[in-house]
Amino acid sequence: MKQSYDRLLLFIVLLLILVGLTAVYSSTSVISPDLLEKYHKKGVMLSQFGFIRKQLLTMGLGLIAMFMAFKIPLGLIRKMSIPLLVISLVCLLMVFTKFGITAGGARRWIRIWPSTFQPSELVKLCMVLFLSFYMSMTRYRTEKFTSFLVPILIMGAFQVVFLKQPDFGAAMSLGLLTISMLFLSGIRLRYIFSLGILVIPVVIKLISEPYRWKRVATFLDPWKDPLGSGFQLVQSFIALGSGGLTGVGLGEGKQKLFFLPEVHTDFIFSMIGEELGFIGAALVALLFFTFFLKGISIARKAADPFHYYLAYGLSIMIAIQAIFNFAVVTGMLPTKGLPLPFISYGGSSLITSMTAVGLLLNVSRNYRQGAEAERDELSARRQSFSPNTETGPSRSRSRTGSHSLPQSGRYQWQRGYWYTRENRRTSGTRRLIGLRGGPRR
């Protein structure tokens, strides 16, 4: 059978990567000595055009990772979900060893010559794999508290390591990702609300740290100290405002000229808004929204519970990072240091995101193969029970002109629709899937 996959999803991702390469090249066309020194401290020796060359190399590695994720059987990935989660935890703990790199007062990277790697990106991907496996195994016991407790304890262990680095942004995104997937599995809402009440004192304690409270104060009023703590956010506002409707022109932005810090990573969306205007920024946001809708569509058509949760989790993972980045750049959230998937400069985020896309395409290939097989079976049944057939089981004609199939069969034809033995309507090319609780059987 010819393999098929969701080509529109692949086209959207490749378009986002192309936008990212263009934005990285534009934002790094003029590099400040301070930025080069920052990367030299990480052990990464880059020149003016070294950023775009490294991003192109990373894109090549990401394409290889995406192809491998597309080809590996999902059954094998399911079996490897727990070992992969353990490997991600080991990588996360390595930041506290001699392989770890300190930058900006945080230990979030490990040295992999000749570059660096951020384990938090791998953790989020492996957490989606584990939760998909776990919830597909416990989908009939979602009302039990133990089904909720196990993933929460595992998430809590990773949260402790994140806060020790510290990386509050990764901790928040992982927490929101886990809760979202548990909600989809049908976990009782009172468990989630109880967890939220218990977490409130912890969040207050974390925010009360002097440097975090300073970020919150800057978020509330960045113009109070526009040349100090609010400098980055104010410059982001200036970049977005300068772009207007159509932008100042590709490569003509001024904020990248040593005004806006981290313009090639966390605040690259500000530069897109400046050079391409509101229209360009809105189109980028629309691409992410379409990506999310396609991911949800793939999940809703999945026939296997593991595939269902995997597609939902990967779509939510990408969406959370994109929404957080948009919110930080526009001043709706305090600065957190989360890159924009597929677009921001950085190897860890790009490779992880492209691996997630490969898994999504893998799920879409599996449900399309299943749909083709089911359609062939239905076609054969229609021919077997057609009115022109001279031999075969007895048939009765209804007022609507449809034909009845034997009650022992897998499908029943009634009033112009095929029904499964559970008496659920099916079109022959897809299965009905609910928003919560996974695929209906």
Model regions and ranges:
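Short, Lys/Arg-rich, polar N-terminal cytosolic tail immediately upstream
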Residues: 1-2
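Transmembrane helices with small-residue packing motifs
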Residues: 30-31
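Hydrophobic alpha-helical transmembrane segments of multi-pass inner membrane proteins, especially
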Residues: 12-18, 26, 37-232, 270-328, ...
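Active-site-proximal inter-transmembrane loops
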Residues: 106-114, 230, 266, 333-341, ...
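Transmembrane alpha-helices of multi-pass inner-membrane enzymes
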Residues: 13, 18, 331-369, 373
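Transmembrane helix boundary and interhelical junction motifs in multipass membrane proteins
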Residues: 167-172, 247-253, 263-265, 278, ...
